[in-house]
């Protein structure tokens, strides 16, 4: 297996560790239509120039007249500047739109922590420099309770150590598929991952042409 030290970095967004404000938003089944609607009311109101980050969570972030919904957690201090989201079960379910992941990144989120994720959304996060972490619901609830008591205390998500740390709480460990972990640590895009194995592919092709020449003599 290749070590991180021997593999060159890619040109994609990477994630090693991040420290920031965590926001507790434990609503279950938040789908991509809520995270990033395709045709939201703000666009109908002539506000098409808003960034993805400004449109993120539009259906629950804004009221019918386009003003902020004061009850929404991310419209409250200090969560306006949150960069870590404590989310509910099945976060990011629904359609495959990549803008759900890029919108969260544009808002400022670097890590989403939830009991489970929509599969396509989960993979889109890795492609866009956002770290999705799966933890038990009870652990997330405990973290959310602690955040609510001390909202301005920052949380650290460390991908190198596979730990989440916060003052007053014991370190929480998490596991991640090795390929996806390396992809974020090294900032590898899909093409970067493929090209890492180009040498092995060339060696295989040369040997296979000797073993099965009839496969390559079809013209």
Predicted regions and their residues:
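Cytosolic catalytic domains that perform sulfur/thiol-centered chemistry
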Residues: 1-88, 92-219
């Amino acid at each position: 297996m290749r070590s991180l030290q021997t593999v060159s970095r890619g040109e994609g967004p990477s994630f090693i560790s991040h420290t920031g404000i965590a926001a507790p938003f434990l609503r279950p089944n938040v789908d991509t239509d809520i995270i990033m609607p395709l045709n939201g009311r703000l666009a109908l109101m002539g506000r098409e120039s808003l960034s993805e980050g400004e449109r993120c969570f539009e259906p629950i972030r804004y009221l019918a007249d386009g003003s902020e919904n004061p009850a929404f957690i991310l419209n409250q201090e200090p969560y306006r500047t949150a960069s870590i989201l404590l989310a509910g079960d099945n976060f990011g379910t629904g359609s495959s739109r990549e803008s759900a992941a890029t919108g969260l990144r544009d808002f400022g989120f670097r890590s989403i922590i939830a009991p489970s994720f929509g599969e396509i959304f989960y993979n889109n996060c890795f492609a866009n420099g956002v770290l999705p972490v799966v933890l038990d619901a009870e652990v997330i609830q405990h973290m959310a309770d602690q955040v609510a008591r001390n909202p301005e205390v920052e949380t650290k998500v460390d991908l190198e150590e596979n730990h989440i740390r916060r003052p007053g709480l014991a370190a929480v460990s998490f596991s991640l598929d090795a390929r996806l972990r390396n992809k974020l640590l090294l900032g590898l895009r899909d093409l970067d991952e493929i090209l890492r194995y180009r040498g092995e592919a060339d060696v295989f092709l040369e040997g296979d042409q000797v073993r099965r020449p009839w496969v390559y003599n079809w013209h």
